[in-house]
Design a protein with these regions (language model features):
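Class I SAM-dependent methyltransferase SAM-binding "motif I" and its flanking Rossmann-like core
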Residues: 99, 105-175
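A residue-level signal for conserved active-site and pocket-lining positions in enzyme catalytic cores
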Residues: 37, 96, 133, 166, ...
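Residue-level preference for short coil/turn positions at secondary-structure junctions
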Residues: 1, 33, 91-92, 125
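Portal/gating segments that form or line small-molecule/metal binding sites
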Residues: 44-100, 105
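General beta-strand structural signal in soluble alpha/beta enzymes
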Residues: 7, 71-72, 97-98, 129-132, ...
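C-terminal and late-domain segments of enzyme folds
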Residues: 1-33, 43-57, 61-64, 143-145, ...
Length: 238
């Protein structure tokens, strides 16, 4: 990917993320025209029409208010991910946004699909990838199985960000914290994982600078150490 990547802990399409999303839109080169934004509710594809429709509507309203031309695409399963009617819209996008839901489902739906390949062509030309929650998790090396509290059942993810796991909602208490603790104990010495608090984003590019934006913090964890970074801080991702 050549465009920016935004790993978002929560808050997609809400006013709390306006500053982050304005930054992402300003980073693209739209040649003086309104940037094209594609909103993908793929991670909610198993939740029914009401949920999918909500994400499509919220994405359209949010980015229209920020001055973009918005294309909410109902790519919700493998058939729609391979539908050629969406290819050109994805290829011409300046920003592609994956909202939250089921990380395993969105990865398995998009992997090797025409939609994913078209999105990659857009990113290679400078488009932004923004992923919230599940949309952020699929860029790490692996996605854990939350149903088993992180004990087995992991699947490979796209591995675009060199973190073993990208964990959104990091400041959220409860069973989620148990999963994080299990995964951390299983890291190898050379591995790290990223935790992204709610209403917070980590924005950057692989091999370049990554900066915290938003309300709270980003956390870099190894098996033996943990470091937290506030908004404006640079996170030293290898």
């Amino acid at each position: 990917m050549k465009g920016l990547i935004a790993l978002v802990g929560s808050g997609e399409y809400l006013p709390v993320m306006n500053e982050v999303d304005r930054h992402l839109l300003a980073s693209v080169h739209a040649n003086g025209s309104q940037p094209n934004v594609v909103c993908l509710p793929t991670a909610a594809g198993q939740e029914g029409e009401a949920s999918v429709g909500k994400w499509l509507r919220m994405g359209a309203e949010h980015f229209t208010a920020l001055g973009a031309v918005v294309h909410p695409l109902p790519i919700i399963d493998r058939a729609s991910a391979d539908d050629p009617q969406y290819v050109s819209t994805l290829e011409q996008a300046d920003l592609i946004y994956f909202s939250g839901g089921n990380p395993r489902y969105v990865y398995e739906t998009m992997k090797g699909s025409q939609a994913w390949e078209a999105a990659n062509r857009a990113w290679s030309c400078g488009a932004v990838y923004a992923g919230c929650s599940a949309g952020a998790m699929i860029l790490g090396r692996k996605v854990p199985d939350f149903r088993r509290l992180g004990l087995g059942g992991q699947i490979d993810a796209f591995g675009i960000v060199p973190a073993e796991f990208v964990m959104p909602h990091f400041d959220h208490a409860g069973p989620f914290r148990q999963v994080v603790n299990v995964l951390r104990r299983r890291l190898r010495d050379e591995d790290f994982m990223l935790g992204i608090d709610e209403d917070t984003a980590l924005v950057g590019k692989p091999g370049e600078e990554w900066r915290v934006m938003g309300k709270s913090r980003v956390h870099l964890l190894t098996r033996k150490a943990a470091t937290s970074f506030a908004a404006g801080d640079i996170v030293p991702i290898p």
